[in-house]
């Protein structure tokens, strides 16, 4: 089937999962973006000296980094090739020094960074949302508490008309339908944040499953990347999965409301992600190792997540490393509009200053 995106067309062997400016991935093909400016104007002298920057990792950030890449190419002529292969793959590739930067939604601790000779810094903030395939259930209408969500993924609640779900949704007609679980099959920062949240709200989940980029799921079918999970949920009636909000919105999927740590029912949005991030203490987080799920702020979305960029502290190619950092500097200075349009939260100026100071001290 043909899947159309901004400026190009591709042939896809899987069910279409669209993101503006992006393309989907499947188990046999990673997702990448390599953007060229669409112009018949001869390149300037500066553009003929353009560099190619390679990155790989989280599918969580792919919609945003794809748009940043296209706009950066148009502005500078430099080309960003980013492979959406999951956080685990991005960590592995940057450790193997096969790319210029890796991307992960799970921060590495200082000992792992030191062992690998890496530094890390945040790029943007977004949110993980439960998505469902239920007839006549509009986005945001189905309400779930954290413990309910954990019990569903534990397999303890197996029907959509279970009394516990009905109790949280008075007046909402729920079918006598089996709940089909969809989860990630690859190493995933999205999975890390989802399972980290469930571990905070369910002692049973923490004991039986725990948190990680990969976990032993009690049941369900696995999809590769946010793209794969979205595709499976769209195909399987009665299913529930979890994706980054941009994937849910662009594919017109039904997402749930969640009850946050303050007891409020909240909808996923850039505003609720910003509320969750508002009290994040980055200044005391060594190497920016901070997870912000289950935040206590008013209006906070419970599964808010940060994407992190990983780069080697030492390099034999100073010009290439400078070009890579220049890309992210450009994103921080010029990428707020794109972030807002795709429902991510741009980093606040004080955090950007902290990141730039980190670059100066850690990337030699």
Curated annotation (Swiss-Prot):
Which Pfam families does this UniProt record tie to the protein? Answer: PBP_like_2
Q: Which UniProt keywords apply?
A: Periplasm, Phosphate transport, Signal, Transport
Highest taxon in the source lineage: Bacteria
Query: What's an example GO cellular component term for this entry?
Result: periplasmic space
Which residues does the record give as phosphate binding sites? Answer: 58-60, 87, 105, 188-190
The record's subcellular location field reads: Periplasm
The family note in this entry says: Belongs to the PstS family.
Q: This chain belongs to which protein, by name?
A: Phosphate-binding protein PstS
From which source organism is this entry?
Xylella fastidiosa (strain Temecula1 / ATCC 700964)
The gene for this chain is pstS
């Amino acid at each position: 089937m043909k899947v159309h995106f901004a400026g190009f067309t591709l042939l896809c062997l899987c069910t279409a999962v669209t993101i503006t400016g992006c393309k989907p991935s499947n188990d046999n093909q990673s997702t990448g973006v390599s953007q060229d400016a669409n112009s018949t104007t001869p390149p300037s002298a500066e553009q003929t000296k353009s560099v190619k920057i390679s990155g790989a990792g989280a599918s969580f950030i792919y919609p945003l980094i794809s748009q940043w890449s296209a706009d950066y190419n148009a502005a500078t002529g430099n080309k960003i090739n980013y492979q959406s292969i999951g956080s685990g793959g991005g960590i592995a590739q940057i450790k193997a020094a096969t790319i210029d930067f890796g991307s992960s939604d799970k921060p590495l601790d200082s000992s792992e960074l030191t062992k690998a000779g890496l530094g890390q810094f945040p790029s943007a903030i977004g949110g993980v949302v439960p998505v469902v395939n239920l007839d006549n259930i509009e986005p945001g209408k189905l309400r779930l508490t954290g413990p309910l969500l954990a019990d569903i993924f534990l397999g303890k609640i197996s029907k959509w008309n279970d009394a516990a779900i009905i109790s949280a949704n008075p007046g909402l007609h729920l079918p006598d339908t089996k709940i089909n679980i969809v989860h990630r099959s690859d190493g995933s920062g999205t999975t890390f944040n989802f399972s980290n949240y469930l571990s905070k709200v369910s002692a049973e989940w923490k004991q039986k499953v725990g948190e990680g980029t990969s976990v032993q799921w009690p049941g369900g079918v696995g999809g590769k990347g946010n793209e794969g999970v979205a595709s499976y949920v769209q195909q399987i009636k009665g299913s529930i999965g979890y994706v980054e909000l941009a994937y849910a919105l662009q594919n017109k999927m039904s997402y749930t409301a969640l009850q946050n740590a303050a007891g409020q029912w909240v909808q996923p949005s850039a505003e609720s992600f910003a509320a969750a991030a508002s009290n994040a203490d980055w200044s005391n987080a060594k190497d920016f190792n901070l997870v912000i799920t289950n935040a206590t702020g008013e209006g906070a979305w419970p599964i808010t997540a940060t994407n992190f960029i990983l780069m080697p502290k030492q390099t034999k190619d100073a010009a290439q490393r400078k070009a890579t950092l220049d890309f992210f500097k450009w994103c921080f200075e010029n990428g707020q509009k794109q972030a807002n349009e795709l429902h991510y939260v741009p980093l606040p100026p004080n955090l950007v200053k902290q990141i730039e100071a980190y670059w100066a001290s850690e990337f030699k």
